[in-house]
Amino acid sequence: MKLLGYDDWSEEKINYFYGGTTQSQTNRRNLELERFRETKANNNFVDYEDFFYNHQRFSSNTRLNVSGGTDKTKFFVAGGINDENGLIKNTGFQRYTVRANIDQKITNAIQLSVNSSYIRSNTDRGFTGNQNRTGASIGYAIAATPNYYDLRQRPDGTYPDNPYFTENPIALTDKSTNNSLVNRSISSFNLGIDLFKGESSYMKFVLNGGLDYLQNTTNIHLPEDLQYQRSIANPGDIMNGKQESFNTNLQAASVYNFNLKRVNMNSQVGMVRLDFKDDLLFVRGQGLAPLQKNVKQAAVQTIFNQFFMRTQEAGIFLQQEANFEDKIIGTLGVRFDKSSLNGDPSKLFAFPKASLAMNLTSFDFLKDHFISQLKPRIAYGETAGPVAFGATYSSLVGVNIGGLLGSSLSTTVGNVNILPETAKELELGVDVGILKNRLSLEATYYIKNTANNIQPLNLSPSSGFTSTSSNLAELSNKGIELSLSGTPFERENFKWNSRLMFWKNDITISKLGIPTYTTGGFGVSYGTFLMKEGEKLGTIVGNPQINPGEYTVWGNSQPKFNMSFNNNFTIYKNFDFSFLFDWKKGGYNVNLTNLNLDEGGNSKDWFGDRNGDGIPNGKQREPEPFNNAGRFVEDASYIKLREVGLYYSMPTEVTQRLFKNKVQRFRAGISGNNLVMITKYSGYDPETSTFGNGLANNIDVGPYPSARRFFLNLSLDF
């Protein structure tokens, strides 16, 4: 894995970092010098980055598949165990899966398929990222702590307090819990009934549906004897969350296929029903009794959040396909949807679609040509995104006045006219193949415009409300996708398959409808995201201020383009070697990990002097004027060797002889992920987003470092 490295401390650096002439500054400087000299004499420096992150951990992934059946009944059963130990102590991930599929031919006219799976995952996340004023972040703590202060556990089992930050990260890691346990069950069925079959037509009825049950239990525990907890009024913090989701879907459709002379027609009409049920409870206890983890054993007990969500959606769809001898293929369709989330839950919204494709090589003028495929295509479609739950209504909040419980209106007012966000997309493309498709090109250009984008609209204070949801914003999305694949070289004992992909996407705020604002991050001092009509989505702005309310543009989180290069080599029919490169050009991150390192004096080049003016780099970051928001906005371009694999498949006759016909296939190999990363980005990984916000992403705040992974692979078929 990539480590950032830390700047070494010296007496000269301490005298500068803790400079000052007041008595308190002098006392602090002398104290730090004493600590440094003692550590130096005992050679007891601690590289905290190495201590927490630089570890080799074992992971395993085991799968077992069993399949079989008869001409009427076929089955597939699979199970898997995935066990990953995290880089950081007491972190990791385990997943257990069971899956069963059954295909039953009830009669010649009735077929039934049933699929079911169960997934149980257990995640110990640890404490990285933003610390939310709890001290619970390894990244924050080690950025502030010099390497000459030893925070490790003492022989008597205690942990020293951290004088440089609000928490000792080693005690935090050893004693605290941040766990998520998920149980999920997914089942589905598909029933097909052939109503009639003729020589040139048939009609069938299709009924399919499914259910998805998810239970997610989260637990965060910060013991009362942690440093930060001892500094607050109610030490000892326990936070328990429980989410239960039960979703079902049911779809019924009639399909009629017939020939209209030389044109095959396929007609569909159907309806769909979706039901969503979500219950969430998040409780918190503060001021825990010693050694307790029960909310009821806390001095302050709070229902931090609770909601019950019930959503219903229904739709009707019609579709007509026409296929002229596989030469010209066209589709027309429309879907009518309604949702209980919309302002008018009974209103049906229409979403049409159409597509046309032509296989020109199926016509006589291109038959037996070196161009083996030439397929221009065009498609248009409309769709919608859901309205946020509760946007229609003005919710009530609980109040306590003189010991009497009551309810009052929230400051956010509902919008009974709220509409779903809609998208209209036009796609133009062509698929080209030459030399019997030994070389293929796929090219697509698309324009996607979204309307009725939901944004908060601030209201006049005299209204008594602060904001409401609005449908005023519009986005314009334009992009291109290219794929070039082929077999550059093929002989009896060697085959090379290759695929090169390129994609580029630009999103512009074509209409905002509300006043310009910034969102995400920690404000204009460090870099935040601009929401302004005519600007690209993801524009990063910050100090210095140009005009009142207008700040310097430092970059954009959208990449200029992405590329991938995938190759597979088959050697002597038994060896397979493959690798995948990913390249992202452009796209900026707000790197606040460096902010924390600079503030703690620990960034790798902190005491260097790049421009020779006598001021350390950590106190004077480019670009000029120094120490503006631009110093945290970095180009996050990268080239990554994403995957590499080398596998050997034993010849069938050798396998059967070696395993006495008990094993039909034996395959072994080695593989790796994230083996090479080429980037100028100074953080752990340019692929980071601490908050996962779609509008304001690409913020780097003490993340969990990404790891290089190596696997030994064994596969046996019995």
Could you say what each language-model-derived stretch is?
Residues 1-89, 127-130, 174-175, 179, ...:
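Residues embedded in well-ordered regular secondary structure
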Residues 1-30, 119-160, 282, 374-399, ...:
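A surface-exposed, glycine/aromatic-enriched loop/edge motif typical of exported proteins
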Residues 32-39, 404-410, 449-472, 506-557, ...:
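Surface-exposed, extracytoplasmic segments of Gram-negative outer-membrane nutrient-acquisition systems
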Residues 35-67, 71, 223, 232-329, ...:
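Outer-membrane beta-barrel transmembrane domain signature of Gram-negative proteins
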Residues 70-152, 177-216, 237-277, 282, ...:
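Transmembrane beta-barrel strand/turn architecture of Gram-negative outer membrane proteins
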Residues 170-176, 300-317, 400-440, 468-491, ...:
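Outer-membrane beta-barrel signature, preferentially recognizing the C-terminal barrel domain
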Residues 277-301, 364-422, 438-475, 513-545:
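Solvent-exposed loop/turn elements at secondary-structure boundaries
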Residues 369-371, 602, 613-718:
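Membrane-interface anchoring segments and C-terminal beta-barrel signals
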